[in-house]
Amino acid sequence: MTNGGGGNNGAANRTEELQPHPVKEQLPGIQYCVNSPPPWLEAVVLGFQHYLLSLGITVLIPSVLVPLMGGGYAEKVKVIQTLLFVSGLTTLFQSFFGTRLPVIAVASYAYIIPITSIIYSTRFTYYTDPFERFVRTMRSIQGALIITGCFQVLICILGVWRNIVRFLSPLSIAPLATFTGLGLYHIGFPLLARCVEVGLPGLILLIFVTQYLPRFLKMKKGVMILDGSRCDRYGMILCIPLVWLFAQLLTSSGVYDHKSHTTQTSCRTDRTGLITNTPWIYIPYPFQWGSPTFDITDSFAMMAASFVTLFESTGLFYASARYGSATPIPPSVVSRGTCWLGVGVLLNGMLGGITGITTSTENVGLLAMTKIGSRRVIQISAAFMIFFSIFGKFGAFFASIPLPIMASLYCIVLCFVSSVGLSYLQFCNLNSFNIKFILGFSFFMAISIPQYFREYYNGGWRSDHHSNWLEDMIRVIFMSHTTVAAIIAIVLDCTLCRDSDEAKKDCGMKWWDKFRLYNLDVRNDEFYGLPCRLNKFFPSH
């Protein structure tokens, strides 16, 4: 007997209605989260990858600034070793007593403008001996860094930064975290193109190994010939030596013998002067260049740079929490982490590390590429940093990797950092015109405003004008894509999206409320709790 009508057949044939992708408070797909360490051998290899990646910025900034100060290869080597030593110490402090997230502390670009102003100050033009000018300039930079480090520690201890971070919502975090990656576009392809014959093959090889090779390893019906996850997990350690060897072959064959000085510096594997000038053993010690000198006008611009690194590090803390498969980091823990970064700035000022300390954007991207967000991996990486800063000959060998090769890796890892900010938009209502305006305006102005200041000061309009401390403060803040994006997004978010329950829901604030205080989510202790029951003595609120 057949059923009458077609209603039942229609119901049986009706396809399941498509639903949006579900919201995920913790990112799935991470193979080892913050507090789940991989096996020791694997952790050592992964930690070494993070160490290699941190070398790029550690070598780049002293290589630019030390010659301007009058220093030679010997001075540059000592500054690099000191910077690496302080970065390793600060990373350990951060992983044990700070945010406890898998982040690495490295040299900051934000301090370059105030440091350059100190270098070109007229009070150092009277020194004809290059070494004497280097020492005098370094002492002045150290004094400014010491004051800046104390300033950063103070505003974090007093809870000022914690209260600022509490104004954040998923809507304002999106541009903040996104531009921590996008804002470093100048160390991507522009740096790679300085030696395109080694940089471009490196980029292509990395993309193939990490993205396409796992697909080729699959047989029919999804059976793997080899574990494809190993490709992205160890893609860096597989590709960088191959491209480095290719660069060595080009150097040995005389390809660059008659090229320009700039090309040889970027492409040759024997032009850094690090290996020959690095001592076998060197331990950085306080005030190795003499007693610091203090000038309050130098410190003002440095404090502005510290303000910029606070925004950058905050965005990267949220990014690393995402890639570590942790819950969103509470504001009190953010303040705790930035306080330890201030300690790193203070240590750099005491030891002579030439610049301030911030969270490494590149290493956060490597968390995503490897899908390993373990805290132990970062602690091992910090141990590598300290070891190779003391036993310098070994570290100098790895630091001699040409920067265009490192730039090929930056093009990969920075894209992951840029995209993690966009993932916070899953908590927002993207059909709201208010949300569309805030997002679009903050993104557009974060590109447009820094470009205006870059043209205004470097494009010839004011290129012959010696800037003062106030102009340096303005330049540092408004030439930072991350800071501009964060300020605009926070102001618009707080003034346009907090006046009703519906508006708060649109910007994600309703979902965000349970993460604004440490004790409102029981999972926070799992990821952010201090060791040895220190939470009893240093409670988070």
Curated annotation (Swiss-Prot):
Task: List the InterPro entries hit by this protein, alphabetically.
Answer: NCS2
> Topology with regard to the membrane?
Multi-pass membrane protein
Key word Lipid metabolism present: no
Q: Which Pfam families match?
A: Xan_ur_permease
Localization per record:
Membrane
| Main subcellular location of this protein, as a coarse class | membrane
Q: Which gene encodes it?
A: NAT10
Q: What is this protein called?
A: Putative nucleobase-ascorbate transporter 10
Q: State any GO CC term.
A: membrane
**Any transmembrane segments, and where?**
52-72, 79-99, 101-121, 141-161, 173-193, 196-216, 235-255, 299-319, 376-396, 397-417, 433-453, 476-496
According to its UniProt record, which protein family does this protein belong to?
Belongs to the nucleobase:cation symporter-2 (NCS2) (TC 2.A.40) family.
Q: Which organism is it from?
A: Arabidopsis thaliana (Mouse-ear cress)
One of the entry's Gene Ontology molecular-function terms is: transmembrane transporter activity
UniProt keyword list: Membrane, Transmembrane, Transmembrane helix, Transport
